[in-house]
């Protein structure tokens, strides 16, 4: 299968060394003492603790804004409020960013300024997930700061433009990342490359913020200080084993948060710890002596939430037959294996394999996930309405 000539490969390096050299590849780690899987009887203890600490901060800010608007407004029993940002690619990111800027007291003098500080939850999918990932993954700077220090340059020189990708060193680095993930025992798909390309535009740091995992947000100062709403990104399940390519309207909605991944939907009804995504589990217990970390790379997750490659719904064509940026992406993955239709999906070792409560997916060793808006619910309101989350939401 033909490869682009600019690829830089490390064929002479052992697979274990390749994995160790990359910040993208999953890494073995000691398993936690707490259970890795729980049934979805409510939100996790960690999320509950965060919300308990966030609630008085959010209520004070919301009450201050309401009395600023109307001094007679009663603030005795305020609801928890959630902000959601829909899919829509870059347009959604930019319009959603404008909304946040107008609501953020650090960044605006508009009449709506201060409402962001009153939020308890924030959710996004697809383009909205890009926004939330960029905001949370960079420790919640102002939108103005992201615009001037990252987005303006990154969007102008987008790596999703083939000429830009081939001209810079990012192409070789992303290639190395994907090869390292494969060397660690996790075959990559085109979503890995896609997520890495997006991360270069949305996350600060070396190699497109490769060291930023979703779970690492729990250590960021604005999160530990409970200064920000609790973030959730959504994605959809596709039962590829049944021969379908796209999710039905009633498909399972998966939630990614800094603490957990899973779903309240019947058929899954379970959650696992985000930090240990990638760990081989059977009925909730590890099948090996170690667990895996780094699988929750934030670039991969924001790529998962915006994965529409499954809409091709066909056996993956040869690299030479694919136009534009998809040819570049395909060529990188083709270094590791012959492409199939499964490369159109974001794949995750199924943490609910043989788990009693997850009847829909308990027989599947792998989950195949796609864009969170493909089931015609383009706004991620589900996390905000799942008990006992927010009692009100707006977008």
PLM features: residue spans?
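Fungal secretory targeting signals
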Residues: 1-20
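A short alpha/beta connector and helix-capping loop motif
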Residues: 379-395
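Signal-peptide-cleavage-adjacent N-terminal segments of secreted and extracellular proteins
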Residues: 16-89, 107
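Patatin-like phospholipase A catalytic core
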Residues: 82, 86, 90-96, 105-107, ...
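Catalytic nucleophile serine of serine hydrolases
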Residues: 126
